[in-house]
Amino acid sequence: MEHIQQGGRLGSKWMAFGLGAGICAVIFLSVFMATYAADHQPGVLIGTKDEVYYSGTATKEDAQSLGNALKAHGYFNDEGASGKGADVFLAKGKDGTTISFITKEGSWEQPRIDSLFEEIGREVAPSVGGFPIQVRLLNIQHDVKQESTVGSVTLAGNDVVYYLGAATASEAQALGKALTAHEFFSGKGADVFLSKHNDGTTLSFVVGDGAWNNPAFVADFERITRQAGPAAGGLPIRLRLVNTSLQVKKGEVIH
């Protein structure tokens, strides 16, 4: 389909997704957190203030790799009061890989916070062995306040369905097959996001600049969503057209 040629593959642009300011508002920076964590888990210092603690079968090398990725993508920025920056926890075991972030009280209830940290997880997953991973938001007592799966399914031709939140690999695989059957996926390397959260199911298509202003393209995406919807669990589905920086340019609910 022509809209694939106009876009469809995103880059490593989570800061352009509007996450920079949001991250600063919700991460917990405290020397007390470091003291608590240091009594329980080994850690790797990134820069002079930020730290990755690791447990289970995760290694020091894993923690260093994750820390480097978080720094490269702007999450770790060597800032914070009292000489302490941000803390992140990496765990590996029989249940897979989990990355946990300490966040300010109540921040997990803010709009788009789930998407914000899922995108961070998507960016750094290759540094800890790849998909899938679990992303958790914790309070200062280490209680899990929010948890999301971040995974991907790659189809023939390098088209990718990312599945987020409560969405599963089998749902992403089924959606990918449906998108192929309905000629959306054509082996040109398109990216689609399937998200399931408390507010329902969202299907996001990465498109080229201006595609969201073209009525014919929009109608095409509406049709594809209705056709592929059963593979994602059925309608209604929130349809979103996003640019290659994952900024939502058009959204509607498809019934």
What positions do the PLM features span?
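Short edge beta-strands and adjacent turn/loop segments
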Residues: 42-46, 75-103, 182-207
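Juxtamembrane low-complexity tails/linkers enriched in Ser/Thr-Pro and polybasic
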Residues: 1-10
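Hydrophobic membrane-insertion alpha-helices, especially the h-region
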Residues: 18-33
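Tandem-repeat/low-complexity and Cys-motif detector
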Residues: 55-58, 88-92, 109, 124-127, ...
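Second-shell loop/turn segments in exported
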Residues: 51-58, 101-111, 160-167, 205-215
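N-terminal presequence-like segments and adjacent domain-start helices
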Residues: 32-66, 151-173
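A short amphipathic beta-strand at an alpha->beta junction
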Residues: 48, 56, 121-148, 165, ...
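Short, non-transmembrane amphipathic alpha-helical segments
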Residues: 66-71, 75-78, 107-132, 175-180, ...
